Curated annotation (Swiss-Prot):
Membrane topology: Single-pass membrane protein
The protein's name in its UniProt record: Sec-independent protein translocase protein TatA
HAMAP family registered for this protein in UniProt: TatA_E (MF_00236)
GO cellular component assignments: TAT protein transport complex
Organism field: Polaromonas sp. (strain JS666 / ATCC BAA-500)
Stretches with biased composition (Basic and acidic residues): 73-83
Gene3D superfamilies: 1.20.5.3310
Gene: tatA
Lineage, opening ranks: Bacteria, Pseudomonadati, Pseudomonadota, Betaproteobacteria, Burkholderiales
InterPro entries with a match to the protein in the record: TatA/B/E, TatA/E
Family label: Belongs to the TatA/E family.
Protein function: Part of the twin-arginine translocation (Tat) system that transports large folded proteins containing a characteristic twin-arginine motif in their signal peptide across membranes. TatA could form the protein-conducting channel of the Tat system.
Length: 83
């Protein structure tokens, strides 16, 4: 009694076909299929690109010196006065 029989599912399917129509259901099915295919392709491509980047060593980080850190065009916010 608690579960649905095959007849319940057939009636639900018939009502859905009557409401949406077969053409609309076909379009929704093909859109869903292409979305799933695109997702799978994206996951496959993501795994290959991640494996390719793991093989290369990272470039060494550059060291910042005082000459680079103090730029003449920067403005100290606290020293600036409102006009």
């Amino acid at each position: 009694m608690g579960s649905f029989s095959i007849w319940h599912w057939l009636i639900v399917l018939l009502i859905v076909v009557m409401v949406f129509g077969t053409k609309k259901l076909k379009n929704m099915g093909s859109d869903l299929g292409s979305a799933v295919k695109g997702f799978k392709d994206g996951m496959k491509d993501g795994g290959q690109s991640a494996a390719a980047t793991d093989d290369k060593p990272a470039a060494p980080a550059g060291q910042v010196t005082n000459a680079q850190a103090s730029d003449k065009t920067t403005i100290d916010v606290e020293a600036r006065q409102k006009s």
